[in-house]
Amino acid sequence: MGGGGMKKIVLALLLLLLPVVCGDVSVYKVWSPYDPPNSPILHVDISEQVLYLGVVNKDEYEHDVIVKVECNGKTWGSGLIPLPPNSHIEKIVEVRVPISDDKEHDAKISLIENGKTIASTTVKVRPYFPVDVKNVTCEDSYKIGNTEVCYSNWFDITLKSNPTAKSDYIAKVWINVKDGDNIIYNGKNDFKTVYIPLGEEVTVSFKVPKIVLDKEKFTVETNVEIMNVTHTIDGVEETIQRRDDSGIYYDYKSVTKYYYFPVVIKNVELYRKIDENTSEFVKNFYDSANILDDEIRDILSDKYLQKDDVLPRYYVIDDPTLAILKITVENKYDRDVKAKLTVKYDNVIFTKIINIDKKEKKDVFIPIYTKKGSKNIVVTINPIDADTLIFNRSYSINIDPKPIPPVIIEKIILPKDEEIGEETNISGYVIIGKRYNMTIFIKNIYNKTLSGKITIDDNFKDGIANYSKEIPFTIEPHQIKEINVPIIFYKEVNGDLKITVSVKGGAKDYTSLAHFYAISPIGIVRIYYNNTLLLGKINVIKENSGIYSAKPIAGFNNTCVVILRNNLNSKVDCDVWIEVIDKDGKVRAKSGIKTVKLDNYSEAKVAFPIFFEEGFEGYTVAHIIPKSVENVDIIYTEVMEST
């Protein structure tokens, strides 16, 4: 008894397991009221959303199943369906697809027995929506093909009952305004309920509060909800019923439709010219700002009035200056438009009313007053009688003004020594050892008091010139200030002084050159030895030839002659002496000092007796000390050889 009971329990368990593990149940085919089996996509009616299944049970046991349909995150389930055993005839099962829109979806169909899936298949499903969006049009627009240029914020939506419709429908309708995939106006809360008779069409109007966009065009998305299924389309569509040998089918086509703003901004850029478009802005700015920029005034006074790359310009760091924007606008509409152009920057709002001819592009020039650097400039434009259609775009404009020195050197007066002579009428022609004044006139062309310094520099060797290297200053607006710079040269030089005017916070330094030609009052024409011997000329052999040269001779009295020239047009007194130095730097002989008086532009010879104990190679050095100047030792060196 106990053993027989155990066999019955085991048999019962096997009977429960066999249908799940060994069953041969399948979904043989799937079709819809519109499409035969094996169609790539099955269409359903939104009112029924029905599919048909052919289910076959080839197993020797009966199966009791539930059909589950999963689609778009929703699930529909049937009641319990018995499938007789060894049935090679399909059982037709009607199922519903839980769809809430008219898009294409994957529908997974599963046969569930005892909580486990014993067969499944997946098909593509899409509802036939019974209403087409026949047209979407702006109430006041200029039509170009399948696009419209709008002049109103009212849109008319025409809905048409299409061939897939089975009855009249009540639809909930709303529109969205879109920029690509971005919704810029969501009208779902402003929906309207519309009655659409079978085979008829109706028109419903919607007012969009305001469209503000940084693109020239947008789309209008129409949403139609019927029986909890929402149909959405950007543009217009048409469904056509067709017949052929295989039966009835439907052709569907849709076109995206674009809507344009009536007036738009095509480009914004920094304008650098002074010409007929900008001269009035420039003149008004410089007159009101009291900036005395000679280059600007010269350009404005030029009858041709054309100069590139002069604007904007700035004088003091962190001070705002004039910049001019060239804004290119376009009227896309088929009639003339009066538009409001607005420019926003640095918490400043500038508005200008402009007239644009129909289908015209034009440049509008707008002055702005801002500091140097990258600026976010927001430009908007709309017709003044259509202020709900606003083109609005932000532009990054780099304000990179040309730096201009706020304090300039008006002029430099260089000393010119009258003793040098009338024939050298050159400023900066001076005598070494004599003190002079260089006069610098600086001018503040800006509209505020400025301070800074004048820096003077040169490329001369050390000890050639002496002057103040830095001179601080403070200068009032438009003031011309005279600054005297004492200067003295100790050696002859022909070169420039670099004069730089630097302003605290100035945009740029002003630099000028002052040329000086410093000369010695007395020049040495020649130094030579005039031996007193009858045979004073020594034959000196050099390379392949011989020459006779007057050389000093050791052990004899020699005479060194120095010829001087007065370079000035006044008398000059000077002390003269000579030294003879060998190549090792040792002084071998030194003359006494002689005072020489030279008339204007005259020459004089001065003879010095020189005696050497022995021969050597070295130099004859002449020293001339003019008595009319200070700290000047004119040195002339002549190579010599004593034999």
Swiss-Prot record:
Keywords: Membrane, Transmembrane, Transmembrane helix. This is Uncharacterized protein MJ0903. It is a single-pass membrane protein. The chain crosses the membrane at residues 9-29. One of its GO terms (cellular component) is membrane. It is found in: Membrane. Its main location: membrane.
